[in-house]
Amino acid sequence: MYKRQLIYIRRPDKKNAGFFQLILFRIADSVITGMCVTIVTLPVILIISGQIPVISLFLNVIVIPLMSLIMISGIFTGIAGMLSLEAAYFFAGAGGYILDFYYKLCSLSSHFKYAVIVTGTPDTARVFLYFTVLIIWICVHVILMNKKIDAVCFALLVCVLTGLHYNIDSDMKIAMLDVGQGDSIVMHTKEGMNVLFDGGSTSKKNVGRYTIYTYLKYCGVRSLDYVFISHPDKDHVNGIYELIELCDNTFEIGTVVLPGIRRTTAVKKQAGDDMSKLERTLKATGINVVYADAGDSIKSGEFSVECMHPCKGYNYESANDYSAVYLVEYGDFSMLMTGDAEKKAEKCIVEDANRMAGDAGESARFMSVNILKVGHHGSKGASSEEFLSYVKPENALISCGAGNSYGHPHTETLQRLSGIGAKVYRTDESGEIAVRVRDGSYKIEAFKALKG
């Protein structure tokens, strides 16, 4: 038997064992070594990448036996390099070919459906518990050498491992990501629905890959059920293109919702090229696309999203004025997503909301929302007094880049928000802004401490 090893396995008698039997036990050695390495390093891998490389257990059968050749190649390369570069190149060749083989092997294996499982990043307490149980297991094994106790400890370790990425959360979570001069808001419902509102930036490069996608992996998000795009400006969609490119076996997008302006002349005049490019990209990837007009909605449990704008048949002079505006409700909680809508769109929203309420025999819509996502990054032309007095937000979230050249948010906009008593949170000052909603109450937290 292997002694003082985490897994018991009978060693063959080399004198009596056949060639194929020795090969099988060599493979078993590689698998066991790979499992031991994975068991020890898995929490670290989860913290760094938020995913489990399942395929690595199988790749180690090939990788580990060849590591000795790479070591030998490296040693001889170092020695030869002191004498002759040509000789060093010769000895480095063997190791280089093996490393190239590793790279191609990993690239090929990444296309398998369950090669990698996205789990999210575990919290510190659970990682500490995992390592505590692991150390206890090793100590018990080394001291007692008892299979039954080993089995109990291993079963406990598996339970803790499962708990590293399994979350039972009764909260709805909202995150306004710090994407610089742009917009991106992610919502997670307790029922497991994941929704993205816009995703772009003109001040951060590769914001889709390195900010939005990284955040989604951190949270263990493997799919976005809905992606709502307010309008096709770069600071709202360039990260979406990157997310589309990242769709593979570990990440997918269900439905993309676009503003219902495809039937208006504004498409040709204002954003025809941008909208057409976006539609072509989505069509090529097979992602489901729907168009939202005022009055359209989706609902899942307590969570609902209703389109308040664009109004049907309206002529738009500015691309920002046809930004899709959505009222998000979760129980008694409400949040208004305004994209880059400005005064003209705001007036249309108020008039249309009152008209729909009157037709239904109801009072005015979304009076006093809990949170307003301030339109157009807090520009002077957005958040008019009429609109704010109608919406009456308790809190206002502004997404803008630090020191941006547009002067966002504008002083007059901040004064108007202050005048109605709304507490303002800004990503240029606070970084990421998180909202937790539970049983009608909510709490807003900033990633960085607010000034003052």
Predicted regions and their residues:
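Non-globular, low-confidence helical/coil segments that flank catalytic cores
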Residues: 7-15, 22-24, 60, 79-452
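Globin-like tetrapyrrole-binding proteins
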Residues: 41
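Conserved small/polar residues in nucleotide/adenosyl-binding loops
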Residues: 1-5
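Hydrophobic/aromatic-rich transmembrane helices and adjacent perimembrane loops
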Residues: 63-66, 71, 98
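Interfacial helix-loop-helix junctions of multi-pass membrane proteins
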Residues: 46-56, 385-387
